[in-house]
Every structure is written in C-alpha cells, then in structure tokens.
UniProtKB/Swiss-Prot annotation:
Notes on activation and inhibition: Activated by micromolar concentrations of calcium and inhibited by calpastatin.
Positions of region (Disordered): 1-36, 604-652
Native source species: Bos taurus (Bovine)
Residue ranges, annotated region (Domain IV): 651-822
Protein known as: Calpain-3
Lineage: Eukaryota, Metazoa, Chordata, Craniata, Vertebrata
Matching CDD domains: Calpain_III, CysPc, EFh_PEF_CAPN3
Binding residues annotated for Ca(2+) 2, in chain numbering: D706, D708, S710, R712, E717
Domain Calpain catalytic: 74-418
Record field: compositional bias (Basic and acidic residues): 623-635
Length: 822
C-alpha cells in the first residue's frame, strides 16, 4: 500500500557552497559521468540544432562597459529596459513612473557610502522583505558581499551607466548586467532605497535580481533562504522553532561564527511566503496603496537641498505598504527578519542570552525587554552597552532575549556556507555531487509514492555511500549525507502562469544483487520495497533538503512532485562527509537481436538508407533461426523472392497472391497502396479503435524499410514490415488495458522494452513529446510509427558503425540523405 505523504506549505532548505574549496570545485563536475548531470546532456542534440534561432552569445560586462566608454554613451539595457515591461506583468501600472539615473536623482551620487552595511537597507513598496532580509545578512560577511557586489564600480571614474552583480544560479555563478535607470515617483525611489539619499548599491542590486527573474513584480513574496542561496550557493536548513533542538542557541551561535546567513519569521496563519499580500488583494489594490504611500512621503519644500550642498543626508522614510500583521509587541507576522548577532549579556548578576534582529523596513521594532527604549538598560553595565552597541535609534535593528525570541518566532532558516553540521565542533571537508534533470509530463513526471502506477517513471539517481564517517565516538557504521532538491526557474516563469510545485524525494536501498546495475528500477520494485528515508514532507517551496545517516550501501534517490503530470526542471545535490557517487540512472541504449555487420565491405552510397535496410534480410533470418553465413545471401529471403516458389509454404503462397493482387505485375507497392492494404487489415480489428494509418505514416514506413532506394516496397520488404506490425500489435493490445485504442504514455517505457528496444530517460522523454497527444495518450498509428522509426534508425546506425565502437561519422550529404528519407 502506498504511504500517505503530507503536502504542506513550509520553507525549504539546501544549496551548494560558493567558496573556492573542495565543495565548490566538486560542484563544477556536475555529475557528468552520469550522462544526465550535465545540463547540455538533456536533449543536447535538439537544443543545439535550434540554438541559432535563439541568438548569439551575450557580451560581457567588460565588453559592454568598454564599448560605452569608447562611444561616450550611457548604457541602456535592451533586455531589461527602463519601461513598464520591467515592472509588472499582471496588469498595466495606472501611473507613470519616471526612470532616472542616480545623477538625475541627487547630487554627488555614490555607489557605496562608508561601506555596505545592514542599516543601509530600507524597504520600498514591493513586498520583497525576504530579499532585503537576506541582503542584511549578506553584509555581515564581507567576502561574500564583495563577490555578489563588485566594489570597483562608481558614478565618477569610468562611469557609463552600467553596473553588474553576481548570483549563484543552480550550480553556476552568473554575472547580471544592468543599466542604472531606476523607477522614481516625485523624484524618490519607488522600491528599495538606502538610509543615505545618495547611496544606490542596494537599489541597483535589487534591480539586477529583478532582471534575473524577469520583472520587479516577480520578487513579490518569497522566502529569505531563496535569496541567501542565490547570494552564496550555500546549503540551507530550516527549523520549526517549536520543534527545535534544545541546543538551538548553540547552533545559531556557531552559524554566526562560521559566517552563515540566518533569517526568521512569525507565521501569520495563512501559510503565505514573506511579503506576500493576502490572496484577496489584487495587483491593482497594491498599486493604489503604493501611490498613496508615495504621495504621503513627498518631500516638503523646506527639505530641498540648497544649491551646491552635498545630498548625503539620511533618507526620509515611512513604513511601506505592507500586508503583514503588526503585533502589540512591535513584531510583525508574516514578515522576514534578519538575524544579525547573538551575544550573552550580564543583567543583575546573571548572564542573559540575546538575539539581535533587523526589520528590513528600517523601522518598526520590538518594544519588549532589551529593545532600544527598554527602561532596564540602566541596570546594564556601561561597557556591556558599548559591546552590544546599544543606541536608541529607529533603524529597524533591535535586541531581544533568546527566551522571547523562541516564544514569538516560529521559523528559523540558516544558510550554511559548507555542509558541516552546526552541532559539530569541528569543520569537515564535504564532497558534493550535482545532477540536473527534469520531469516531463506523460513520461517522467510520475508524482509521489501515492501514485504507484507512475511513481517509478520519475528520474532516478543512484547514490553509492562508499565510506563510513570518521567518528570514534560513534560505534555505528554510518554515512552522513545531505540531499537537496531544488526546482528551477519557477519564479522567473510566474508571468507565464507558473507556480512552485510541491516537491520532495524518497530514498530506497538497492538490493545487493542489483548493485552496479544502472537499470531504471521498475514498478514492482517500489510496490514491494519500502523507502529507507525520505524528505519529511512535500513542500511548495523552491528547495527541500534533509540530513540522513544510513549504512554504507547503494541507494536510489527518486525526486518527484507531489502530483503527477507536473513538468519542470530541477537540480539534485548530495553532500557527504566521505566519498560518494551520485549519478542518474541511465539505461544502456541497445536493441535486442543485434544485426550482424558486414565485415570489411564499405557502404556504396546509392542510398545509404537503402543500404542500411539491406540488413532486413539478416534480421528476418535471425528471427526464423536460419543459418546466417553469407550476408549477400541473407539480404534476400529465398522463400519470398519473386519467381522462387518451390520452397514456399501454403501460408507464404497465400501471402504472395494477396500481395500480387495489390501490387500488380511489378510486385511493388507505393505509399498509397501500402496505406490501403494496411488499413484494410487493421479495420477488421475493431478493438484497436483506430482510424487507420495516414499517408505520411506509410511514407515513413517505406523509407525505413526500403532496401533498394526505389521508394517502394517489394514482397520481401512488405513481409518483414507485416511481421513487425503483427508483433507490435500484440504489445499494443497488452498495454491497452481499457481497450480505448490508446495506451498511456507512461506505459510506453514498458512497451518499448517489450519490443526489444532499450533507451535512456532522455529518449523516452523525446518519444512522449513526439508521439503522445495532449492527453498523454498514444494511438495505434503513432505507436507503430514510433517503432518503425526506432528499428530503422537502429539499423541505420548499425550499418554505419563499421568498427563497432558505437560512434559513426557522416558527411553532410550522408546525413541529409539519411534523415530526409525517413
């Protein structure tokens, strides 16, 4: 019986380290040995042939910057233009924003004023507090900050209106280039701004992140860990504070010491991501509130800067339009906070554990014990105050006791820069393997274990845990590892209607007799074997990760969406303390009853398609158990050769007579005649419920069975085709269990295997895309056409693979003849 897997809304964990150590280095390999780990390995032939349609390679920041300086022009980004298309996609904005460059907004604009720090960040009206909370955490780690935000940029030296930032994207670091045009209203920045009016690094960083996801609106609502991962490539872990371990404070302390990024939040009871408006609030209402907010914050005339004075005063701020729920204690539900420090302070002779948090609004703070204006600060020693940097200022940052923290907050997210367990006192070197894959509707999007008929079709990844942990205090022979599953590009595709899928994974132990066997595990295996481990829940967040401890062995990881038929891409990473091997399960591509090759005899290129099809006779003789001694003799079947009737059986004689009636005296049939004879036969099989073969299908059959390049089929060729169709018809009926005249595309895997073809996951995906209808069903005509093409292409490859090394070399004429006549 399938186990019930809960589906819930919860933040996710996991990602890959960015530091140039062993983890980052290993990640560069991306599991290329598996065949499915390299992103170019997914339908690479199809993607490559269509690449010229997409366009040329983008120019780098350095090239664009140099070009602008040479031409003495300011850069305008054509990919993310300063207009409404870069702002919102769900509806048109009712008022006109003015896009301005920083020198047009204020005098003496600066990229960074006095160093980038957490107090620079003030949230605008976008609802991206999750992103800004992550920026505040990022400023605490200067090494990471300098990677994301190259500091050699300014509005004076070599200024050309162009800036760039770097983000981690699914295993790679990408450089995002933007112009410095920013949306303004009443000469004020609409979205993120700095505490200093003439500082713009954070507004430009937000714009680069918006470009990465397609628009500013795409940033509305999210989880802090998502941005943390994109800033670091780190591994994120998620804690429900009510279920947190007793030493949670120790875990948080070590996270701070190791440069990890931390965020927290308070559930608002709606299961919404941070900064997301209530479901009833439409984009139009958000826009109206934004306009009211901006009108209310318009500068007074007396606030104008006298001519010639520097415009580096603090920004005038108001609380932005928010939909989170503010509590009496000053905290806000459904809102993201940054954890910026942990300390212990002496208070009335006792040590008190403290947590420092920051609200990305830049104001609205905790008003309880240890808040800025707490009356009992007078009982705290002066030196302690200095150490805690206590000051009464409305900057959004505040202290609170750890006890109050765990009482009020419900979620804690920690983005680690390595996969070291924070409970451990020592740092280890972890190894990582990275695989990229996709769920394809109708083929490899099988859903979770609750759907046993399709679960087995999901991508599968073999995990070999080869060595146990080095832990002298642990008597168990155990391997520690972390699995992180991340779905790709869902935020960017929001404007196309995409939402985050509910995802998770299960881990099964592979039986010893199947170790080293890379075959895709079948349905029966999962029906009769329970998982050894799995993600705690399926969640509709970008990533889910989990730590496990299992004995050394061989396992299979099955990542999936909760519901079947949901199509998308993902990245699966496995971190372990010791050496491991994680690779996608890929069947060896082959066909049963391999055709014997003609040794030392080159193909004469009258029609290489026809020459490759001369192996038909060999295949036929092999099936009939005949002696295959002479390739030339095998090329024709003597029993069905015109004029040779002495050895024919009664059945063969009847077959010849029927064929003569159709073909006439020349004993050859064209595509129209083939269509008539095949449809005359299949129409008698009412259970197939087919409308018959199309003319195009019959043309393909002739091309793939033609041995002499005549464009017609003789008796022998037709006999071979007919035998194949009868065999494939039996397979089709076997899988057409409901007698609908179609088979489910998920069952095509087994049907292809029963026909003697062994393919990998990519080819199964391609078959589904090519032959299934919109309901993911394959009718009899498409079924036969698929098998005819498979047989013909295997046979053609075999004929051209003269030395049997699995590689063929064709010139352009050979390639076009082979593919056009198919």
């Amino acid at each position: 019986m399938p186990t019930v897997i809960s589906a819930s809304v919860a933040p996710r964990t996991g990602a890959e380290p960015m530091s140039p150590g062993p983890i980052a280095q290993a990640a560069q390999d991306k599991g290329t040995e598996a065949g499915g780990g390299n992103p170019s390995g997914i339908y690479s032939a199809i993607i490559s042939r269509n690449f010229p349609i997409i366009g040329v390679k983008e120019k780098t920041f350095e090239q664009l910057h140099k070009k602008c300086l040479e031409k003495k022009v300011l850069f305008v980004d054509p990919e993310f233009p300063p207009d409404e298309t870069s702002l919102f996609y769900s509806q048109k904005f009712p008022i006109q924003f003015v896009w301005k460059r920083p020198p047009e907004i204020c005098e003496n604009p600066r990229f960074i004023v006095g160093g980038a720090n957490r107090t620079d960040i003030c949230q605008g009206d976008l609802g991206d507090c999750w992103f800004l909370a992550a920026i505040a955490c990022l400023t605490l780690n200067k090494r990471l900050l300098f990677r994301v935000i190259p500091h050699d940029q300014s509005f004076t030296e070599n200024y050309a209106g162009i800036f760039h930032f770097q983000f981690w994207r699914y295993g790679d670091w990408v450089d995002v280039v933007i112009d410095d045009c920013l949306p303004t209203y009443n000469n004020q920045l609409v979205f993120t701004k700095s505490n200093h009016r003439n500082e713009f690094w954070n507004a430009l960083l937000e714009k680069a992140y918006a470009k990465l996801h397609g628009s500013y609106e795409a940033l509305k609502g999210g989880n802090t860990t998502e941005a943390m991962e994109d800033f670091t490539g780190g591994v994120t872990e998620f804690f429900e504070i009510k279920d947190a371990p007793r030493d949670m404070y120790k875990i948080m302390k070590k996270a701070i010491e190791r440069g990890s990024l931390m965020g927290c939040s308070i559930d608002d009871g709606t299961n919404m991501t941070y900064g997301t408006s209530p479901s009833g609030l439409k984009m139009g209402e958000l826009i109206e509130r934004m306009v009211r907010n901006m009108d209310n914050s318009r500068l007074r005339d007396s606030d104008l800067i006298p001519e010639g004075c520097s415009d580096d005063r603090p920004t005038r701020m108001i609380v932005p339009v928010q939909f989170e729920t503010r509590m009496a204690c000053g905290l806000v539900k459904g809102h993201a906070y940054s954890v910026t420090g942990l300390e212990e302070a002496l208070y009335k002779g006792e040590k008190v554990k403290l947590v420092r948090l920051r609200n990305p609004w830049g104001q609205v703070e905790w008003n309880g014990s240890w808040s800025d204006s707490w009356k009992d600060w007078s009982y705290v020693d002066k030196d302690e105050k200095a150490r805690l940097q206590h000051q009464v200022t409305e900057d959004g940052e505040f202290w609170m006791s750890y006890d109050d923290f765990i009482y009020h907050f419900t979620k804690l997210e920690i983005c680690n820069l390595t996969a070291d367990a924070l409970e451990s006192d020592k740092l280890q070197t972890w190894t990582v393997s990275v695989n990229e894959g996709r769920w394809v509707r109708g083929c490899s999007a099988g859903g979770c274990r609750n759907f046993p008929d399709t679960f087995w079709t999901n991508p599968q990844y073999r995990l070999k845990l080869l060595e146990e942990d080095d832990d002298p205090d642990d008597s168990e022979v155990i391997c520690s590892f972390l699995v992180a599953l991340m779905q790709k590009n869902r935020r960017k595709d929001r404007k196309l209607g995409a939402n985050l899928f509910t995802i998770g994974f299960a881990i099964y132990e592979v039986p010893k007799e199947m170790h080293g066997n890379k075959q895709h595990l079948q349905k029966d295996f999962f029906l009769y074997n329970a998982s050894k481990a799995r993600s705690r829940t399926y969640i509709n967040m970008r990533e889910v990760s989990e730590r496990f401890r299992l004995p050394p062995s061989e396992y299979v990881i099955v990542p999936s969406t909760y519901e079947p038929h949901q199509e998308g891409e993902f990245i699966l990473r496995v971190f372990s303390e010791k050496r491991n091997l994680s690779e996608e399960v890929e069947n060896t591509i082959s066909v049963d009853r391999p055709v014997k090759k003609k040794k030392n005899k080159p193909i004469i290129f009258v029609s290489d398609r026809a020459n490759s099809n001369k192996e038909l006779g060999v295949d036929q003789e092999t099936e009939e158990g005949k002696d295959n001694t002479s390739p030339d003799k095998q090329a024709k079947s003597p029993q069905l050769e015109p004029g040779n009737t002495d050895q024919e059986s009664e059945e063969q004689r009847q077959f010849r007579n029927i064929f003569r009636q159709i073909a006439g005296d020349d004993m050859e049939i064209c595509a129209d005649e083939l269509k008539n004879v095949l449809n005359r036969v299949v129409n008698k099989h009412k259970d197939l419920k087919t409308q018959g073969f199309t003319l195009e299908s019959c043309r393909s059959m002739i091309a793939l069975m033609d041995t002499d390049g005549s464009g017609r089929l003789n008796l022998q060729e037709f006999h071979h085709l007919w035998k194949k169709i009868k065999t494939w018809q039996k397979i089709f009926k076997h899988y057409d269990t409901d007698q609908s005249g179609t088979i489910n595309s998920y069952e095509m895997r087994n049907a292809v295997k029963d026909a003697g073809f062994h393919l990998n996951n990519q080819l199964y995906d391609i078959i589904t895309m090519r032959y299934a209808d919109k309901y993911m069903n394959i009718d009899f005509d498409s079924f036969i056409c698929c098998f005819v093409r498979l047989e013909g292409m295997f046979r053609a490859f075999n004929a051209f693979d003269k030395d049997g090394d699995g590689i063929i070399k064709l010139n352009v004429l050979e390639w076009l003849q082979l593919t056009m006549y198919a």
